[in-house]
Amino acid sequence: MIRIHSLLDMKTQGSSRGSAALGAAYAIAAAAIFSTAGVIVRHIELPAWDVSFWRSAFLVITMLPFLLWQQRRIWIDVRSAGPALLLSALLLAGSFVAFILALGLAPVANVLIMFGATPFITAIAARLFLGEKLHSHTILAMAVAVVGLAISVAGSLQAGALAGMAVAFIVVLCMSGNYVVVRHRRDVGMAPAIWLAGVISGLVALPFAHPETVMWSQVPWLLALSPGQLAGGLLLYMASLKRIPAGRAALLGLLELVLGPVWVWLFDGEKPDDLTLIGGSIVIAAAAANVWLDSRRPAG
């Protein structure tokens, strides 16, 4: 069982095979949690800005008790992380707002397809700024995933979806940047950045939102979207970045773009077409093969 305080701490972990396997498990679990966002948003039935505001507000409210519980350690992390924590918060806030807006402009499958670019941008940025090595099998897995992504795009593009996909690409840039920042400062806990991002994104959304229109029947879905889906997924992803390279964590995150349309298909009847399913299967196979090959590498 994963303890919340161990994720909030998120100090640098060892580079053993066991630690890397745990990091991969965290990344996969985070992707599975993130993949539920589309189906949850579909059940809220509020304008995008309202969803963005309440998602941020509930994140701030629910995370605060945990941060206060760990306040001594949190203040140490805040002082140690310095500008990196603020940069992480700004990048996360940008992704929070852009993601909800993208879902309001395009079908879930189209939005998630854009997230397929995340591991490539992350891996390149990590190589340039952190000097992280890219193994040949990881590069091959990324190339195969590009093929799957291209097939999915061919099957999923719809009229009017380009605007949503363009906004989704902002999410990709923000998340890739955050992965690199968190990986760079893996010596400190970056959980406060999630809370601060909620504050920033809530303030950005407030002028465009009408919070008073929310109904009690929508509150459970908002709670599932915010502390459940958003905070839980981010804590797991940040924990994974303490144990595995940023590019590998982002590659495993591709599972989100495959699972997301599946949940919407199963629960809302928004069925992706055959090319989207074929492309998604290729992406899953590439990610799975990369994990398997990583597991066969000598520890160290």
PLM features per residue range, with description:
Residues A32-T36, I40-H43, F66, L86-L101, ...:
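Hydrophobic alpha-helical transmembrane segments of multi-pass membrane transport proteins
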Residues I2-F53, A57, L90, A98, ...:
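Glycine-/small-residue-enriched transmembrane alpha-helix faces in small-molecule transporters
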Residues M1-A29, V60-L87, F99-I100, L130-I139, ...:
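Membrane-interface interhelical linkers
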Residues I44, V51, R55, A102, ...:
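Hydrophobic/aromatic residues within transmembrane alpha-helices
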Residues I2-I4, L8-Q13, S56, A154, ...:
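C-terminal-most transmembrane helix of multi-pass membrane proteins
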Residues F58-T62, M114-L128, A143-V144, V199-V204, ...:
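Alpha-helical transmembrane segments of compact multi-pass small-molecule transporters, enriched
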Residues I2, M63, L92, L134-A154, ...:
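Hydrophobic transmembrane alpha-helices of multi-pass small-molecule transport proteins
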Residues R79, L112-F115, L128-I151, G155-M165, ...:
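Loop-to-transmembrane alpha-helix entry segments
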